[in-house]
Every structure is written in structure tokens, then in C-alpha cells.
Amino acid sequence: MLDQRLVRENPELMARELARRGLTVDLNSLQALAQQQRDLEEQRSSLQAEGNRVGKEVGLKIKAGADPKGSDVAELRQQGNAIKQKVAVLEDEERQLAAELKTQLLTFPNLPSPACPDGRDENDNIEVRSWGDPRRQEGLDEHWAIADRLGLLDSERSVRIAQSRFVTLFGQGARLERALINFMLDLHTGKGYREVLPPVLVNSASLTGSGQLPKFAEESFRCADDDLWLTPTAEVPLTSLHRDEIIPLDQLPLRYVAYSPCFRREAGSYGRDTRGLIRLHQFNKVELYWFVHPDHADEAHAAITADAEAVLQALELPYRVLELCTGDLGFSAARTYDLEVWLAGAGAYREISSCSVCGDFQARRSSIRTKDGKTTRLVHTLNGSGLAIGRTMAALLENGQQADGSVLLPQALVPYFGSDRLQPE
């Protein structure tokens, strides 16, 4: 959530930075709310000061020998009670205004970092670097065809069980999924991340804290009878691990890694990626999450991105790193690096990880702070996929396919999978 002080003190900056995202906003109503709230605060403070003065005067009169039940004291006490009632009314009005202001602020995305390149959409993203030698060869199959041939998954039975955009993995496919999850968790915990296995169901406060609500409610699955949602990413429960907490400064940075199933409606993706593992309603992902001191956010962003890249390098998968422009940033992100893995069958790069620094945006929504000397301040948060399992499997199938129909796997996976290749069953 954006800082309310921006609305009151620098609305021009807020409007200008949102315009970098391609958003034209009218802040007049927001400014009016913020000013009303400030006026009420000043009225309440003035009344409370007057109430304190009256209370002290009562004490002084009694100390000087006045009758506690006398008319002078009674009149002052009556005056004090009237002030308390007025203060209570103002506090109630303040709460209502604060709630309305917060409701409006929750709909605004994060402001882009000054370092984030300006641009309109994904066409303006900037390639930062690449790694590996992409396999460019005619006649290679896409991953869904390879998976069908090897008997790794069944989409038709999944439609019978659930609906479209679900898959059921069998045999080597299920084993490879499990191997990838364990490999990624071991790689990240070996670098000092603390492993977390969070709830798959999360409440509305958690989704609001990470930035999914209220904007993306229609893209998530909600339980009919409870205030619970299927999590779209482990970023949601990881953000709320420290909601409403003050993290001791000497504990920062906190680095977590979590495997979780993820659930998304994929609204607006009709007709795209209808086959295979690229765009599903349910998929598995290993997520990286950092809580850091604000002064260390930039170096943490480089580090979390490098940790996601390390998975691709260990799996010998060619990829490139793109810095997203302002027009392509996610809702909660201030700056993002996307990792795109090469799919040899499709002959294209596809996103497999987004590594974002969110500044204090999520921390303000979730009230996550640290104590810096005598000052309490919001922490900064970062997140990144490390990695999406299904898309990693798709890349392994397409890049490792062999002329005899088998799929050669990278050596790093052999201890987890038990073999260096997938064979037709």
C-alpha cells in the first residue's frame, strides 16, 4: 500500500509515478479524504489538550482545598465529560475516514523504482544478460507431445476429474516433479534459506497483505463457506509470516524458501497454452522470499535473482534475464527481473521466474516493521520463483529430447530422479 503522506504532501509525485505505469488517476477524492482525516486529527488533538487542561485544573482546585463535590469542581468535571464525548465522536469519524482512505489506497499499485526503465508493455522490456547455448533445430517436439509419447501426463482424465487446464502426472512424470521440488529445496536451503511448508488455504488478510486483494479477487479460487482462498503463490503466506510484527534488526535479512501448490483461474488466458504444463489452474512452485532492511534491498534483489538463476544453470537450461519496464510491472513490484527459459521445441523463450523488489509496499499493507535504533520503520520485501516446477519440466523435455525418443536429464537431477534419462514406458 502507498504511504498516505504521499497523498497529503506530494500528490503530484504519486500521479507522476503512476503515470510511468501507464495509469492516469484522479487523486482529488483521495486528497479530500486525506485532508478531512488530517482536519479531524487536529480537532481531536486540540480537544484532548483542552480536556487535559480541565483535568489538571480539577486536581489543582481540590489540592487547594476546594470541595470535590462543590459547584466549581462539578462544572469543570461536566466540561471534561463533554469534551470526552466530543473526542469519542471525532475518533469514530476518524476511524471511518481512515477505513475509506485505506480501501481506496489498496487499489493503487506500487510506485516503480527510479531505476526501473520506462516503457508501455512487454515489448519495452530490456534484455540484461543471457546464459547457455539455446538449441535451435528443426523438427523438435514441444513438451506436451513428448510427455504424451512417454506417458508422463494425462490431460483428458484430468478434465474428467476436474476441468480443463489441469493435468495428472504418472510414473516418470510424477517422479520427475518430485525430484525437481526436492532438488530446488536442497539447492536453496544449502545457500542458507530457511525452508517453510505453509498452508495452502489463506485468509483475505493474507491476500490483501501481499497485494492480491482486492484487485485480483476474480483470478483466485475462494472457499464458499469460509474466509479462505486457495493460495495463488507461496508469496502470499510467506508475506504474512511476520504480519503485525516488529522483526529485530539483528535478525534481518530473513530468507525463506517454500514449496507449495498454486491455484489460479487464469482469467483472460482463453485459447492460450491450452496444452501441456505452461498455463494451469493448479501447479507446483518453489518460492523465495526475503525480508530486508531498506538500505539493503538493491543488493538483495541482485542476490535473489542470482539464486533463481542458479537453478537454471545447475539444470543446464539456457535462459535470458529481462528487466521489466514500468508498463509491465506486477501490481506489488517496484522493480522486476524476469527469467525466461529457452524451450527448444517451441523455439522461444518463456517466463519461468519473476524476481521482484517490492519496497515497503507489502510491509505497509501487512504492518511488518523493524527497530532501527529508536526508530521503528517498515522492512522491505522481495520475492522470486525458484522455480515454477511445471515450466521447468517443460524446458527439460524440450531441451533434452533425443532422436531415439528418450529425454536426457542433467547430471544434477540424477541423484533425485535415479536415472539420467526418461525412457518410453
Swiss-Prot record:
Q: What EC class is this?
A: ligase
What GO cellular-component annotations does this UniProt entry give?
cytoplasm
> Binding of ATP: at which residues?
264-266, 351-354
The pathway is: Aminoacyl-tRNA biosynthesis; selenocysteinyl-tRNA(Sec) biosynthesis; L-seryl-tRNA(Sec) from L-serine and tRNA(Sec): step 1/1
Q: What is its main location?
A: cytoplasm
One GO process term, biological-process aspect: seryl-tRNA aminoacylation
Cited InterPro entries: aa-tRNA-synt_IIb (IPR002314), aa-tRNA-synth_II (IPR006195), aa-tRNA-synth_II/BPL/LPL (IPR045864), Ser-tRNA-ligase_type_1 (IPR002317), Ser-tRNA-synth_1_N (IPR015866), SerRS_1_N_sf (IPR042103), SerRS_core (IPR033729), tRNA-bd_arm (IPR010978)
Q: Which reaction does it catalyse?
A: tRNA(Ser) + L-serine + ATP = L-seryl-tRNA(Ser) + AMP + diphosphate + H(+); tRNA(Sec) + L-serine + ATP = L-seryl-tRNA(Sec) + AMP + diphosphate + H(+)
Q: Report keywords, A-Z.
A: Aminoacyl-tRNA synthetase, ATP-binding, Cytoplasm, Ligase, Nucleotide-binding, Protein biosynthesis
Question: Which residues does L-serine bind?
Answer: 233-235, 287, 385
Domain of life according to the entry: Bacteria
Query: Which compartments does it reside in?
Result: Cytoplasm
Q: By its UniProt entry, which Pfam families does this protein fall under?
A: Seryl_tRNA_N, tRNA-synt_2b
Family indicated by similarity: Belongs to the class-II aminoacyl-tRNA synthetase family. Type-1 seryl-tRNA synthetase subfamily.
| Subunit relationships | Homodimer. The tRNA molecule binds across the dimer.
In UniProt terms, what function does this protein have? Answer: Catalyzes the attachment of serine to tRNA(Ser). Is also able to aminoacylate tRNA(Sec) with serine, to form the misacylated tRNA L-seryl-tRNA(Sec), which will be further converted into selenocysteinyl-tRNA(Sec).
Q: What is this protein called?
A: Serine--tRNA ligase
